[in-house]
């Protein structure tokens, strides 16, 4: 039986549960449940604090876990990334009062508040800087106003919270983060784990592509299929209409409209784009 960790709350939890449900796994049901056994798939899901997940996986108590890259790195647990999930994107940066001039070198000898002390200490050590790192479990942005810290290091998504507190990020990004699946370091993925990973990959692939159908004159088929090569070649079927064929191919979601414009310019008709729910590619 697989034991999988999922964030117990927050934005990572919500999207992770959506993906798992789309992949055919049992939902949490009660938001206060600490674990759910999916008998049909022989998987037990444990709902844990995101910052603790990598530690449990590294210790062997759990097989895989969904967490943030920044949280996994800060935990210093012996895990590796098995799969990037493409949501929960953010950056980890230093920030200080917006009305002051700051550089990373100015952090030397200062007080830095953060919920990610190991990421900060590692970065400072790599730069040869020394500072007092204050660990806080939340509301890091207000620590400067309260006189606890001179600067902070925190996760930045939109930057709105920083601006509300009169802060601005400075220096380069310490870590670019997103939701990831982590496994124990130096341990191969098992066949049971591969089934779960393949299902999730199928959901992610489906989100990135659309299925495109259109009709085109055979005289323009080569030009049209050059625009829609698909993953391993488009499907081409004859139509009752003389010298015309129907074409079906997967296309990247981001460029679907531009592709449809090109097909229309080639004389293609009945150009339709449809969602792909699940895929195995």
UniProtKB/Swiss-Prot annotation:
Intracellular or extracellular location(s): Cytoplasm
Keyword set includes ATP-binding: yes
Stored Gene3D superfamilies: 3.30.70.120, Periplasmic binding protein-like II
Matching InterPro entries: ATP-PRT_HisG_long (IPR020621), ATP_PRibTrfase_cat (IPR013820), ATP_PRibTrfase_CS (IPR018198), ATP_PRibTrfase_HisG (IPR001348), HisG_C (IPR013115), N-reg_PII-like_a/b (IPR011322), N-reg_PII/ATP_PRibTrfase_C (IPR015867)
Molecular function as annotated in GO: ATP binding; ATP phosphoribosyltransferase activity; magnesium ion binding
Regulation: Feedback inhibited by histidine.
Keyword Repressor: no
PROSITE patterns: ATP_P_PHORIBOSYLTR
Catalytic activity from the UniProt record: 1-(5-phospho-beta-D-ribosyl)-ATP + diphosphate = 5-phospho-alpha-D-ribose 1-diphosphate + ATP
A biological process term (GO) from this entry: L-histidine biosynthetic process
Pathway linked to the protein: Amino-acid biosynthesis; L-histidine biosynthesis; L-histidine from 5-phospho-alpha-D-ribose 1-diphosphate: step 1/9
Cofactor: Mg(2+)
Keywords on record: Amino-acid biosynthesis, ATP-binding, Cytoplasm, Glycosyltransferase, Histidine biosynthesis, Magnesium, Metal-binding, Nucleotide-binding, Transferase
GO cellular component, one term: cytoplasm
EC nos: 2.4.2.17
Chain's role: Catalyzes the condensation of ATP and 5-phosphoribose 1-diphosphate to form N'-(5'-phosphoribosyl)-ATP (PR-ATP). Has a crucial role in the pathway because the rate of histidine biosynthesis seems to be controlled primarily by regulation of HisG enzymatic activity.
Homology family: Belongs to the ATP phosphoribosyltransferase family. Long subfamily.
Protein name: ATP phosphoribosyltransferase
Native species: Corynebacterium glutamicum (strain ATCC 13032 / DSM 20300 / JCM 1318 / BCRC 11384 / CCUG 27702 / LMG 3730 / NBRC 12168 / NCIMB 10025 / NRRL B-2784 / 534)
Name of the encoding gene: hisG
């Amino acid at each position: 039986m697989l034991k999988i960790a999922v964030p117990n709350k927050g934005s990572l939890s919500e999207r992770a549960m959506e993906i798992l449900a789309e992949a055919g796994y049992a939902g949490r049901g009660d938001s206060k449940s600490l674990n759910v056994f999916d008998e049909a798939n022989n998987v037990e899901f444990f709902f844990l604090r995101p910052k603790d997940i990598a530690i449990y996986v590294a210790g062997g108590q759990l097989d895989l876990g969904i967490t943030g890259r920044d949280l996994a790195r800060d935990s210093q647990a012996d895990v590796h990334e098995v799969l990037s999930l493409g949501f929960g994107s953010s950056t980890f940066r230093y920030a200080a009062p917006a009305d002051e001039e700051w550089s990373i070198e100015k952090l030397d000898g200062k007080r830095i508040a953060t919920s990610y002390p190991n990421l900060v200490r590692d970065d400072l050590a790599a730069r040869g800087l020394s500072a007092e790192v204050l660990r806080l479990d939340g509301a890091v942005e207000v620590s400067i106003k309260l006189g606890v810290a001179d600067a902070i290091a925190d996760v930045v998504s939109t930057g709105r919270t920083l601006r509300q507190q009169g802060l601005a990020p400075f220096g380069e990004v310490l870590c670019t983060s997103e939701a990831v699946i982590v496994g124990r370091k130096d341990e191969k993925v098992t066949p049971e784990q591969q089934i779960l990973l393949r299902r999730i990959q199928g959901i992610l692939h489906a989100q990135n592509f659309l299925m495109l159908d259109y009709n085109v004159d055979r005289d323009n088929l080569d030009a049209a299929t050059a625009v829609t090569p698909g993953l391993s070649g488009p499907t081409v079927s004859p139509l009752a209409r003389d010298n015309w064929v129907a074409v079906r191919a997967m296309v990247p979601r981001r460029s679907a409209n531009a592709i449809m414009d090109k097909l229309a310019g080639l004389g293609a008709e009945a150009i339709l784009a449809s969602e792909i729910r699940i895929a195995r590619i």
